[in-house]
């Protein structure tokens, strides 16, 4: 038996680290249907950069690191590292399809300013 604790899985709740809408989960599941391999998850993260100081990132990942939070929605697993979780607390990830095209949208209550493109923010 290993001394390393398994990553914590959160059930949907109002105080959840990251809120993932049904539309976002459905789009991720659609994208993952074309992927081959093991248990692929969507990793949502924050990096330095962009015109406002921080920017959002998305990548598919098969690994879960110690301290990561796993959020499950409609059969899709979303992974957030502890540092990104600080900046994403209470944020909502949605998916929009319209005249402007298709895009994931993050509504972050922690952001004090955002870039016009919506991919970067400041706290």
UniProtKB/Swiss-Prot annotation:
Binding residues annotated for iron-sulfur cluster, in chain numbering: 51, 115, 117
GO-annotated molecular function: 2 iron, 2 sulfur cluster binding; 4 iron, 4 sulfur cluster binding; iron ion binding
Annotated keywords: Iron, Iron-sulfur, Metal-binding
Cofactor(s) recorded in Swiss-Prot or TrEMBL: iron-sulfur cluster
Cofactor note: Binds 1 iron-sulfur cluster per subunit.
Keyword Metal-binding: yes
UniProt-listed InterPro entries: FeS_biogenesis, FeS_cluster_insertion, FeS_cluster_insertion_CS, FeS_cluster_insertion_RrpA, HesB-like_dom_sf
Signal sequence residues: none
Family: Belongs to the HesB/IscA family.
The name this protein goes by in its record: Iron-sulfur cluster insertion protein ErpA
Originating species: Halorhodospira halophila (strain DSM 244 / SL1) (Ectothiorhodospira halophila (strain DSM 244 / SL1))
Name of the gene: erpA
């Amino acid at each position: 038996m290993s001394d390393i604790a398994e990553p914590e899985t959160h059930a949907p709740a109002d105080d959840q680290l990251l809120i993932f809408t049904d539309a976002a989960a459905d789009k991720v599941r659609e994208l993952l249907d074309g992927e081959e391999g093991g248990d692929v998850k969507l990793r949502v993260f924050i990096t330095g950069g962009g015109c406002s100081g921080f920017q959002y990132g998305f990548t598919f990942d098969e690994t879960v690191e110690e301290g990561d939070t796993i959020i499950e929605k409609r059969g899709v697993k979303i992974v957030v590292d502890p540092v990104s979780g600080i900046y994403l607390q209470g944020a909502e990830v949605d998916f929009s399809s319209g005249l402007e095209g298709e895009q994931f949208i993050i509504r972050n209550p922690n952001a004090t300013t955002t870039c016009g493109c919506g991919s970067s923010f400041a706290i």
